[in-house]
């Protein structure tokens, strides 16, 4: 492939990586990962509410990795509330999973910025054949994509398996018990998903630029060596 086309492809991949890094940084700091609807189970059972009557006992919340806000309703009007995961909810949430989500998000940002630098260096500089060259591009794209995948899996498990929304809704609520009615992943979660997809796309762009996948190259070399041994 002509060098000019390679420059265009690498520049495109570098710009996509840079936009991903900015997107993930913004996503980590915003409370737009999950939007949930919560039902005041205690109040609804006391009055035997059904149908439209349940609307008086429906609240909602939205939250991210660090903080969130919502409204509780238990038949006596709306009660707005705000919360922070650290230090407010440390005793109520699976802390190890939550910290790992934040950690992998930070690693994702750092590696995505490294990938941006590598792509631009390959477009305009004279890369080495090892770390700064195609091997480094494939490696950074693969690890970054893996981090993005881990962030989504860990966060989904925290929300669904560990019932994060219910734990938040019932935090410091001694009288009323709340149950999650509906949960939807919102903007920030899908930004991480797009970033994961972009790293997969970058791998295809590297291949489109004319560089073989690392494992394919090693297999071809191994086949050649075996053939040479048989000849001699």
Swiss-Prot record:
Protein's cellular compartments: Cell membrane
The keyword Transmembrane is annotated on this UniProt entry: yes
Glycan attachment positions: 48, 184
Gene3D superfamilies for this protein: 1.20.140.150
Chief subcellular location: membrane
InterPro entries for the chain: Clarin
Transmembrane segments: 8-28, 101-121, 135-155, 186-206
Membrane topology: Multi-pass membrane protein
Key word Transmembrane present: yes
GO biological process: actin filament organization; auditory receptor cell development; auditory receptor cell stereocilium organization; cell motility; equilibrioception; neuromuscular process controlling balance; photoreceptor cell maintenance; positive regulation of lamellipodium assembly
Keywords: Cell membrane, Glycoprotein, Hearing, Membrane, Sensory transduction, Transmembrane, Transmembrane helix, Vision
GO cellular component: basal part of cell; lamellipodium; microtubule cytoskeleton; microvillus; plasma membrane; stereocilium; trans-Golgi network transport vesicle
Annotated function: May have a role in the excitatory ribbon synapse junctions between hair cells and cochlear ganglion cells and presumably also in analogous synapses within the retina.
Family of the protein in this entry: Belongs to the clarin family.
Protein name as it appears in the record: Clarin-1
Native species: Mus musculus (Mouse)
């Amino acid at each position: 492939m002509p060098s000019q086309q390679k420059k265009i492809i690498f520049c495109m991949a570098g710009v996509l990586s840079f936009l991903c890094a900015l997107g993930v940084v913004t996503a980590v700091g915003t409370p737009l990962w999950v939007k949930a609807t919560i039902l005041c189970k205690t109040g609804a059972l006391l009055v035997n509410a059904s149908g439209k009557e349940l609307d008086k006992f429906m609240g909602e919340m939205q939250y991210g990795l660090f903080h969130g806000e919502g409204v509780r309703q238990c038949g006596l009007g709306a009660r707005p509330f705000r919360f922070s995961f650290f230090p407010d909810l440390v005793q109520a949430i699976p802390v190890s999973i939550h910290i790992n989500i934040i950690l992998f998000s930070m690693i994702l940002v750092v590696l995505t910025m490294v990938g941006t630098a590598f792509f631009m260096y390959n477009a305009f500089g004279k890369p080495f054949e090892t770390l700064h060259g195609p091997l480094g591009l494939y490696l950074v794209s693969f690890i970054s994509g893996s981090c993005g995948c881990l962030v989504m899996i860990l966060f989904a498990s925290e929300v669904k398996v560990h019932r994060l929304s219910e734990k938040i809704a019932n935090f410091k609520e001694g009288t009323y018990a709340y149950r999650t009615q509906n949960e939807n992943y919102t903007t920030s979660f899908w930004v991480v998903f797009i970033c994961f997809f972009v790293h997969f796309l970058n791998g295809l762009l590297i291949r489109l630029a004319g560089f073989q996948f690392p494992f394919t190259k090693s297999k071809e070399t191994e086949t050649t060596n075996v053939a040479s041994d048989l000849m001699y």
